[in-house]
Design a protein with these regions (language model features):
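Metalloprotease/metallohydrolase-associated module, dominated by Zn2+-dependent proteases
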Residues: 126-194
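Surface-exposed patches in mature extracellular/periplasmic domains of secreted proteins
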Residues: 60-70, 120-126, 161-170
C-alpha cells in the first residue's frame, strides 16, 4: 500500500481552530478522512484548556481570546514545544503533566502580554529585567522581554511551583517584582525561585 493510499484510509481526530473562551465547552471531535494533502495529526483537547482558564481567573487576569491547538508532534510548532502566532497557540508536546502545563501557560502568556501591555509597561519591564529588546529575533531567546514575560507569567500562574530556569535573574524577589510589573498584582501563591 503506498503512502497516498495509507493517508487516504487513515483518519485523524481533528478540532480545527478550537476557540477556547471562558464558559464554553469544546465541540465534539470531528472524524476527517486524511488525503494526500493532509498530514495525520492528532490534536488532543482535554481538561487542560479549562485548567488554563481557571489559572487566569484565579489570578484575576482576563483569558486571552485565542485558539488553542494541542499536537502530538513538533511540526506545527516549528520544532519547538509551543508556538504563539497572534491568534493561535500551538502546544506540541505529548506528555501530560507540569511541563506541558507550563508550555501552555507560557504561550498563553505571550497572548496575554500582546493584548494587555502597552509600550510604557513593556519598557518598564525591559528596564527592570536589564533587557535591551522586547522581541528581536537577533537577541538570544532568554534575553528577549517577550520570552521573559511569558516565562514569568507562567511561573506566577502555575499551580505546582517551578523555577523558570531558562531565564536569568530568577531569584524570588526579582521574579515577584517582574510579575507585579506585568499584571499589576501579586503572585497568587508562593512559588519556587532560582
Amino acid at each position: 500500500m503506498d503512502t497516498a493510499s495509507t493517508l487516504t484510509r487513515a483518519t485523524a481526530t481533528l478540532l480545527a481552530a478550537l476557540a477556547i473562551q471562558p464558559g464554553t465547552t469544546p465541540p465534539e471531535p470531528i472524524e476527517v478522512a486524511a488525503t494526500k494533502a493532509t498530514q495525520v495529526v492528532e490534536i488532543v483537547v482535554d481538561a487542560q484548556a479549562g485548567w488554563a482558564i481557571e489559572r487566569f481567573d484565579l489570578a484575576g487576569l482576563e483569558f486571552p481570546e485565542v485558539s488553542v491547538l494541542f499536537h502530538e508532534t513538533k511540526d506545527a510548532c516549528q520544532d519547538n514545544v509551543g508556538l504563539y502566532t497572534g491568534d493561535t497557540i500551538h502546544v506540541c508536546i505529548r506528555a501530560d503533566g507540569t511541563y506541558r502545563d507550563k508550555v501552555l501557560l507560557h504561550e498563553l502568556g505571550h497572548a496575554w502580554a500582546a493584548r494587555n501591555l502597552d509600550d510604557a509597561q513593556r519598557q518598564t519591564f525591559l528596564e527592570l529585567r536589564g533587557l535591551g529588546a522586547w522581541n528581536d529575533s537577533g537577541t538570544d531567546w532568554g534575553e528577549r522581554g517577550f520570552e521573559q514575560a511569558a516565562e514569568i507569567l507562567a511561573w506566577g500562574l502555575l499551580e505546582i511551583p517551578t523555577t523558570p530556569a531558562q531565564i536569568s535573574t530568577n531569584d524570588c524577589e526579582s521574579l515577584t517584582e517582574a510579575y507585579e510589573i506585568l499584571v499589576g498584582a501579586g503572585v497568587p501563591r508562593q512559588q519556587v525561585c532560582g
